[in-house]
Curated annotation (Swiss-Prot):
CDD domains: Arginase. The gene is CAR1. It is found in: Cytoplasm. InterPro entries: Arginase, Ureohydrolase, Ureohydrolase_dom_sf, Ureohydrolase_Mn_BS. Mn(2+) 1 binds at residues 193, 216, 220, 322. This is Arginase.
Amino acid sequence: MAQRNCWRRSWLGVGGGLCLGAHGAARGPRQLFHLTAKQSSAASDAKCRRWRAAGRGGGAGGVYNGRGAAAGSRQTSGMAHNEHPHYKFFESKKASLVMAPFSGGQGKSGVEDGPKYLLKQGLREGVEGLGWEIEVQRPLDGHDFEERKQRATEVVGRAKNPTLVGEATHLIHDAVRAAAHAGRLPVTLGGDHSIAIGTVSGVLDRYPDAGLLWVDAHADINTLASTESGNLHGCPVSFLMGLERESWPAPLAWVPGTLRPSKIAYIGLRDVDPEEKEILRRLGITAFSMYHVDRYGINKVVEMALAAINPDGTGPVMVSYDVDAIDPMYVPATGTPVRGGLTLREGLFIVERVAETGNLVALDVVECNPELAAHDLHVVDTVQTGCSIARCALGETLL
């Protein structure tokens, strides 16, 4: 989560094979393990992998899980390969697009426009073309969260804007919860990643045993004691798990905090604070960094992640997808880009594979920020990627 505290643009090509970590320490290149056997016709994917080799920080680390099993020993029972996307929890194929134009979990403006741009790019029509009946929910309409943020000076302990975040995420929680209980698949468009406090808790109200795939460059599990920035988009997982509840500001006291460590798995991590690493280890949380994607390949990583949170392969799974999990070559208009990320195809494969299991019950797509684009093409690239994530999760295939 380190770059939640300091946005860097090292991905622009600064430096000769070295990048700076969260605290300024030089991080060197790391050999890739699986790429020689992996053929790609896309030159940009190959270039992204070279950037990954040069720019990804950190050591090999481990895959942390609640039962201490090695990653390679994970079984994938109940998950057949080569299936078509299907949705056993939503045979009627009804979904709710929940608009969450909220930026109060961090300091930059523009991310509140993400949902508007995703819709303008044709996300709704694309999903309807896949056979889904769509309704649009706007739980934040009529509230002046963005205007209030411009005037906000509230800090409780280290937490910035806890009242804004608490109120907005509660409204989002209620909308997602209602959609899930009505038999609709909630697809929430953010907004910054603090909105997941509302989305995940809303889904867990309907599916208390659901597993959560958190696809992100950052772990977002800082507590109010460990966060350096105070930005709550770097803390949603700690709230969802009920960590250090005694320190929570009153506006966030409504959060149930029922997510169990054994029910979350990360994919795509590459910028994690030291305190977050300790939390992951202490709680035994399954976490796959870009090292593991490089070593095992994305297919095996996804299978291991799904097996960790859904051992028998039959339970519900939700996906909370921060677009910065994908390398900024493909997703430049986002608030905390970190080079060395997933290729576009790797990023889409994750949700394609979840769709094939039939277990998807909810999706978040967050952190598209058109205002941070250097030019219009960056906006198009980022927004099109966000739309592709949603379409692939809801059944779009290459063949």
